[in-house]
Amino acid sequence: MIYDFVPFHLVAEEIAKNLENHYDDVDLKDDYGRPNLDWDSYLQLSLAGRCRVVTVRDEERLVGYSCFCISNNLNHKGVIEAANTGIFIDKEYRGKITLELIRKSDEYLKAIGVIEAIYILNDDRIGALLRRAKYKAKHTVWSNQYDSISFTAT
């Protein structure tokens, strides 16, 4: 497997081609329905050096990725955080490379000065892998969904 840490805009087209299939492959879906990424914001963040992706390739084929938006913690000046906005592993590679993807992500993020990586997930299997990678449940996420959610593609 070949791991790399690249700006989002360098792999955006590749991720876009596979996004619908990735959504279909995921067992647990969120309440929002099919993805409708804000590509402009992702690309702007990427060009500003604030959105990066750890990729996993089997030769040339993209078989996994983990995307992070990187920012300064507004309550603790000088603390750089990386929020995971998406993690995906091709079905045939699950259970084989996910833990290594998490560990490689940690290495790459530490190398650019990130102090804390944050994953917000609704999948206990990935949570179990994060625990194996020395993550701990640290923050409680509370959510209040107002009325029904209906989005229109823009």
Each language-model region and where it sits:
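Conserved acetyl-CoA-binding loop-helix of GNAT-fold acetyltransferases
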Residues: 94-107
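Conserved beta-strand in the GNAT
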Residues: 55, 61-70
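Conserved active-site alpha-helix within GNAT-family acetyltransferase domains
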Residues: 121-140, 150-152
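A short beta-loop-alpha structural element at the N-terminal edge
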Residues: 1-19
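A short helix-loop-beta-strand connector motif used in the catalytic cores of GNAT acetyltransferases and
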Residues: 43-55
